């Protein structure tokens, strides 16, 4: 029942979820207690492991026992056995535990004091919780169910997956929206809720609970990645704001009270999603993480995995690469776009690792080694002190003037000491080998701008974008292969085989069965993997489009080549490959869905932008601005800049906060309760193809055909079913063969059906009898004689 089994069902479901989550954190702590991961990262990795177990273990047994309670009990037993084995094999001595920070109470206080992002996470998490609470089939006083703006569409589809998997228990599952077709959509983001629904949780609780844990994993995974990469809490904080409170420059189109009022009154007329003004870069919280469960659960794995993999590359331990490979291999049926993005990120990072592994080494020791090496290499040339010290025996402006150390010198020295991996601390970043990363962005922007001009005249890029993308990727792979051969010629193959090699093998072992069983069969249609140029730009010049959509991060990205270290630019380089691929090809019928790739690239863009902002402040603000307006004034100015960059996002979040729409009428909800009580989970019910049809969403029953807004973008051939639905409503007496063809047991009739079809009610009486009726809604049972 979508109402749940009361307190008992809720407690059982919450307990089941908590057991997997808690045991996963225990496993993560045990496996990583001797590694150089903070306790926060250990628990984060453990929580991801627990959720992966909850998503995958029941499915392993479901192949034999279907998606039943038996499969879930066995899954829990498997998790318990795994905990026992890990606890038995992994012993953490007291000394190994003591080496980690943030172990005592006062150390935990320091954790919160040194990482103020916790405050922003708490506020944003509260917003997320409120939106889920007010948007997830909220019961109104009259018995109807309501939702919000962003969840008005996709939530119905996710409900149908959750309820049908749990109620029908068939595995592998089929589309309840198109019976007879294997469910190839990445359904693990929904099966995790199906497990809780099976335990007795209400549909609302089963839907919301896993999302609460997932959003925290997304928040923490992003922050840990940026901090590992850039090494500073302040930079990670700014990057976090730029990504999760993104807004762009769309607010400039809402320059009077009337237009601002429309933001909160119209359907999708916000500063981040306004088609008439070509505003397409949506607000992450509102339009990506709240309504799109696959994206949420995909990022909940991807972001912590990237942070974990970053440290694994630096540590070069086989165990860490095996763990990363297992998590990566589990991604395809959670979120295929995240898996594809991960592949591109790993390809770029592998290339960097083959060139210089020290790029991924973080910490003061590594910074000291780099600074010392740079100092030795640049201190003397031809017996003379270079520009980093003196020129021709005379102190430079950054060293001494008239034999005295200037305040600028001291300030620069302090900045360099505290930011050892930045450009200002080492002249090594200015070498010729680093120049490519400083020009890559501008070359890419020029390339796509020229492509856009050519495309406007003859649609060259729209026709041949896929071929251009394949050629570009092939050249990248060839260069990667060349670097790989050079690496193997100069170093031991074992060093690579037991890190990246074993990572690739583990990924393929876990991912290939998913790809062949589900993904490839559905992605083989003509509308998958095809040429498409410039994502969702509808008329703007290429650079202008991204300038107004991304706003401050794009401006800072343009400046980054002048202020950000080559090391940080290189590690953030995966966004270049992701952007190149996503701008030339589409990977499903909905072109817009390439933003699921672009937003992963934006993770690195926000990191680079945050680093650029910090560098600009430390190079120029600390010297010039502080003397004019004081340090507090500079900090306030920076805060105002970030606030302005987030105004569009705040307005969009405000719109989502107040949005309220009726999703299912009171009589429709009552009809669904009747259907759940009086029909079997495998009965097929004839309904309209409306996206918010309550029957598949609330009851999990199969219908003849669901909404084209779902089925078309999944690459399914639904058109004949859609035509037959109309025929069965408009000419039921002459459509008896269709009732037999689709094995229709019941007919659902409401204002949705009356408004969509010219319903022949008299004809319906010839094939079915009314068994339930309330207001405009009636349920009909097809006569047995139809099937004789």
Task: State the predicted function of each range.
Residues 1-111, 367, 373-376, 409, ...:
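Membrane-embedded, hydrophobic transmembrane alpha-helices
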């Amino acid at each position: 029942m979508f109402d749940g089994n009361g307190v008992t069902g809720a407690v059982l479901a919450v307990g089941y979820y908590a057991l997997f989550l808690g045991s996963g954190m225990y496993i993560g702590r045990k496996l990583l207690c001797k590694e150089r991961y903070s306790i926060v990262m250990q628990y984060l990795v453990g929580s991801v492991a627990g959720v992966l177990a909850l998503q995958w273990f029941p499915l392993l047994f479901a192949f034999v026992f279907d998606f039943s309670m038996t499969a879930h009990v066995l899954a829990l037993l498997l998790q318990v056995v795994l905990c026992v084995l890990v606890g038995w094999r992994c012993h953490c001595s007291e000394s190994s535990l003591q080496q980690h920070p943030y172990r005592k109470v006062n150390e935990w206080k320091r954790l919160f004091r040194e990482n103020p992002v916790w405050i922003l996470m708490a506020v944003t998490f509260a917003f997320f919780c409120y939106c889920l609470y007010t948007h997830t089939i909220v019961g109104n006083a009259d018995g109807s169910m309501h939702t919000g703006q962003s969840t008005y569409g996709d939530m119905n589809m996710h409900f149908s997956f959750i309820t049908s998997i749990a109620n029908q228990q068939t595995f592998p599952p089929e589309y309840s929206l198109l019976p007879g077709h294997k469910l190839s959509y990445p359904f693990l983001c929904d099966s995790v809720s199906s497990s809780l629904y099976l335990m007795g949780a209400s549909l609302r609780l089963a839907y919301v609970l896993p999302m609460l844990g997932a959003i925290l994993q997304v928040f923490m995974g992003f922050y840990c990645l940026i901090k590992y990469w850039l090494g500073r809490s302040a930079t990670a904080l700014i990057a976090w704001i730029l990504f999760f409170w993104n807004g762009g420059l769309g607010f400039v189109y809402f320059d009077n009270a009337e237009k601002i009022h429309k933001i909160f009154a119209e359907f999708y007329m916000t500063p981040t999603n306004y088609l008439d003004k070509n505003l397409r870069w949506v607000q992450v919280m509102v339009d990506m993480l709240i309504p799109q469960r696959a994206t949420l659960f995909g990022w909940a794995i991807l972001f912590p995995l990237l942070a974990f993999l970053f440290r694994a590359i630096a540590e070069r331990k086989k165990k860490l690469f095996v763990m990363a490979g297992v998590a990566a291999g589990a991604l395809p049926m959670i979120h295929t776009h995240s898996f594809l993005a991960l592949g591109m990120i790993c390809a770029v990072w592998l290339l960097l690792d083959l060139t210089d592994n020290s790029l991924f080494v973080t910490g003061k020791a590594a910074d000291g080694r780099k600074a010392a090496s740079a100092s030795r290499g640049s201190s003397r040339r031809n017996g003379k002190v270079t520009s980093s010290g003196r020129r021709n025996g005379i102190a430079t402006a950054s060293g001494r003037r008239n034999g005295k150390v200037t305040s600028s010198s001291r300030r620069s020295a302090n900045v360099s000491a505290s930011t050892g991996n930045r450009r200002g601390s080492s002249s090594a970043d200015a070498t010729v080998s680093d120049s490519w990363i400083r020009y890559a962005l501008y070359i890419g922007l020029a390339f796509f701008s020229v492509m856009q001009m050519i495309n406007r005249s003859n649609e060259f890029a729209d026709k041949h974008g896929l071929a251009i993308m394949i050629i570009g990727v092939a050249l990248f792979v060839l260069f990667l292969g060349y670097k790989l051969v050079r690496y193997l010629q100069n170093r031991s193959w074992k060093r690579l085989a037991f890190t990246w090699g074993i990572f690739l093998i583990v990924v393929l072992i876990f991912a290939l069965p998913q790809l062949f069983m589900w993904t490839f069969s559905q992605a083989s249609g003509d509308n998958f993997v095809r040429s498409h140029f410039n994502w969702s730009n509808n008329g703007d010049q290429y650079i202008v489009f991204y300038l107004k959509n991304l706003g401050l991060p794009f401006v800072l990205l343009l400046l980054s080549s002048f202020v950000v270290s080559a090391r940080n630019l290189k590690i953030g380089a995966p966004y270049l490959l992701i952007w190149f691929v996503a701008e030339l090809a589409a990977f499903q019928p909905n072109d817009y869905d390439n933003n699921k790739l672009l937003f992963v690239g934006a993770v690195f863009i926000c990191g680079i932008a945050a680093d650029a902002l910090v560098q600009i402040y430390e190079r120029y603000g600390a010297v010039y601005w502080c003397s004019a307006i004081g340090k507090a004034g500079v900090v306030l100015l920076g805060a105002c800049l970030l606030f302005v960059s987030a105004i569009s996002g705040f307005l969009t979040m405000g719109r989502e906060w107040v949005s309220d729409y009726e999703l299912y009428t009171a009589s429709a909800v009552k009809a669904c309760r009747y259907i759940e009580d009086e029909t079997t989970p495998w009965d097929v019910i004839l309904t309209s193809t409306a996206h918010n049809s309550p029957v598949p969403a609330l009851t999990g029953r199969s219908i003849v055909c669901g909404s084209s807004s779902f089925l078309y973008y999944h690459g399914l051939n639904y058109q004949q079913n859609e035509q037959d639905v109309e025929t069965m409503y408009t000419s039921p007496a002459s459509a008896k063969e269709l009732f037999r063809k689709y094995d229709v047991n019941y007919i659902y009739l409401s204002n949705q059906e009356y408004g969509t079809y010219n319903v022949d009610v008299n004809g319906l009486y010839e094939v079915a009898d009314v068994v339930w009726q309330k207001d405009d809604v009636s349920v009909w049972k097809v006569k047995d004689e139809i099937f004789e």
